[in-house]
């Protein structure tokens, strides 16, 4: 047996040398994270699932790597009991060719776990070929499934780690084997956004699924999407992973959990922010203000808007320490009329010592570009994957030094990747658990439902004017008004007289061809309001509060700040370029070249948060409380890592 292990080790060593030549600029951890990120784009699963997968893959690679470097830290899974599941480990006799064995163990751990997870996914055919091709490309046998790691079998060790983590995943009942389905029946019937108003809603404080299939059948399939994306739409009334509060976290503990009950059902809620504002309560005014702000900002999504704004770091800085608490602070933090928030602009680039140059752009291009750049919906890396990709790009920057938390010696590429992937993916996993546990319990309404419901009620500003209703939309000159005599929206038979109208992005009815058409902003009946999104994915299939984008992004930004030892991107500036009429997919645009700029990781995260308001997906309450949860998650993760790593 020992002889066979020696032969296998020599064989793998030769292939390790070949693979190192092929992937000379990338570590084993990097090549496997790369292939997983590309698999996300081919998959129809949600951000919660991908955050968990990235974390489990990162933990598998970390535990495999640590076998060869026991002085570097403690195992996360191996030899420990996690949430009642025992990860037995009998020790490992490391081969003499340590580097090649390490490469093999990491590769088998990552590949086998991906294979086990994707075997039940609808995207199996689309993704598995890439996993298998990579294994063969680096000279490893994808069909070698032994988990016997005795006598220094590096491949068996990797397989063992992967299979134990997969078994652990089954034990926590995430739903790996049945599509992650969990019962959470909506209290409201579906809203068809192609039909005016929202008369069918029963509870305006609660989530309402959307039904866009009929509209797609009328309008035609979105040519920018793939055929398999259509299957996602057919299940749009299913709340995505409402059971995620039951999933085992990375760094959070029972001290972070609140046990809540609603409708006879018990919920585990992590980092509970408390309830959002509800209509029919003392927080009526806050409810109306939050959703009305979304409608107000929607009017900015027009390239013909003459407003120019400076989006350089000298004009827009991070919001750390500035987040509002009271309703009055919310109103001061957000610019209801013009968009944006208060922040702490950067006086100068701390790396170069020079001031940041202004970056004037059309507001209507900026808002549309960030709404699409950060959307991270179908056929993208998803929000967790977007931040993992950003971490990789930071690491690739020639100006970046791989010093853990900015201190000590420069780490080799593999150690940096192993550590940083676990740190970031762990925090993203906890962000997903926190955000979705909150979403499931509070089950909060989305703007499209609230805005249309209030418009059906009428106006709440003046009891002497037509259509007065205490729970209607407020009248705001130039933003929300009544359709009066001689208004073209009134209709030939004046059927719409005194209905509410909003100055807003006009919606997908004005876009027949995304390559040539721009809906623009204008006066529309409020009952027809749409968010600035694809008509086929108008709003995500789960509750709004809190924003997943805000939670993911702030958690990621704070972790990246900690592990790099600096809040700043390498060189003190990161830019993302978009060419004229060569980026937007919801409609034509941008109308001019535009460059997004961020000095700090937190600025990028804050922009993500605002993109969801301009995109019509979240009101401020979803955003701000999500940011706060993200901050807490990051802090918990960083403290945990300090004990895990040596």
Where do the PLM segments sit?
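Acidic/polar surface patches and capping/hinge elements
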Residues: 20-646
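Bacterial Sec-dependent N-terminal signal peptides
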Residues: 1-21
């Amino acid at each position: 047996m020992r002889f066979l292990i020696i032969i296998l080790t020599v064989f793998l060593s030769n292939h390790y040398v070949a693979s190192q030549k092929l992937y000379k600029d990338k570590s084993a951890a990097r090549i496997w994270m790369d292939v997983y990120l590309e698999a996300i784009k081919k998959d129809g699963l949600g951000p919660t699932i991908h955050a968990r997968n990235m974390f489990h893959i990162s933990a598998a690679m970390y535990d495999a790597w640590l076998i060869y470097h026991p002085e570097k830290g403690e195992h996360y899974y191996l030899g420990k009991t996690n949430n009642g599941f025992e990860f037995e480990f009998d020790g490992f006799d490391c081969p003499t060719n340590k580097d090649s064995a390490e490469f093999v163990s990491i590769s088998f751990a990552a590949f086998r776990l991906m294979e086990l997870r994707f075997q039940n996914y609808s995207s199996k055919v689309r993704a598995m070929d890439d996993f298998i091709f990579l294994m063969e490309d680096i000279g490893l046998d994808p069909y070698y499934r032994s988990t016997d790691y005795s006598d220094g079998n590096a491949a068996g060790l990797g397989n063992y780690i992967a299979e134990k983590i997969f078994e652990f995943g089954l034990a926590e009942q995430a739903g790996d084997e049945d599509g992650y389905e969990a019962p959470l029946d909506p209290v409201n019937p579906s809203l068809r956004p192609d039909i005016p108003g929202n008369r069918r809603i029963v509870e305006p404080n609660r989530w309402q699924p959307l039904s866009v299939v009929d509209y797609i059948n009328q309008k035609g399939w979105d040519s920018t999407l793939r055929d398999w994306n259509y299957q996602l739409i057919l299940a749009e009334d299913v709340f995505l992973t409402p059971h995620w509060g039951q999933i085992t976290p990375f760094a959070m503990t029972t001290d972070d959990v609140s046990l809540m009950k609603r409708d006879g059902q018990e919920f585990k809620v992590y980092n509970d922010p408390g309830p959002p504002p509800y209509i029919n309560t003392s927080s009526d005014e806050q409810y109306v203000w939050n959703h009305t702000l979304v409608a107000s900002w929607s009017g900015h999504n027009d390239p013909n808007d003459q407003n120019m704004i400076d989006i350089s770091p000298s004009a827009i800085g991070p919001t750390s320490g500035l987040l509002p608490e009271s309703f009055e602070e919310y109103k001061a933090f957000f610019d209801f009329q013009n968009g944006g928030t208060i922040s702490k602009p950067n006086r100068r680039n701390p790396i170069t010592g020079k001031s940041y140059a202004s970056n004037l752009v059309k507001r209507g291009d900026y808002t549309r570009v960030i709404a699409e750049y950060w959307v991270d919906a179908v056929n993208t890396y998803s929000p967790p994957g977007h931040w993992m990709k950003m971490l990789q790009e930071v690491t690739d920057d020639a100006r970046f030094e791989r010093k853990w938390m900015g201190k000590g010696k420069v780490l080799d590429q593999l150690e940096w990747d192993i550590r940083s992937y676990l740190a970031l993916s762990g925090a993203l996993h906890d962000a997903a658990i926190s955000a979705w546990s909150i979403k499931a319990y509070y089950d909060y309404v989305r703007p499209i439902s609230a805005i249309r419901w209030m418009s059906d009620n009428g106006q709440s500003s003046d009891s002497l004017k037509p259509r007065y209703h205490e729970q209607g939309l407020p009248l705001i000159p130039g933003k929300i008004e009544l359709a009066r005599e001689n208004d073209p929206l009134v209709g030939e038979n004046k059927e719409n007289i005194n209905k509410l109208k909003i100055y807003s992005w006009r919606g997908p009815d004005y876009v027949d061809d995304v390559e040539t058409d721009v809906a623009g902003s204008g006066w529309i009946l409020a009952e027809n309001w749409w968010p600035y999104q694809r008509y086929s994915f108008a709003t995500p299939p789960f509750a709004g509060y809190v924003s997943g984008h805000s939670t993911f992004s702030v958690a990621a930004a704070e972790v990246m700040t900690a592990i790099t030892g600096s809040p700043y991107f390498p060189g003190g500036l990161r830019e993302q370029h978009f060419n004229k009429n060569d980026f937007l997919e919801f409609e034509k645009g941008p109308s001019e070249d535009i460059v997004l700029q961020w000095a700090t990781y937190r600025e990028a995260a804050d922009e993500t948060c605002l993109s969801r308001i301009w995109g019509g997906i979240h009101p401020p309450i979803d955003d701000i409380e999500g940011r706060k949860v993200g901050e807490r998650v990051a802090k918990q993760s960083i403290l945990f890592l300090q004990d895990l790593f040596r």
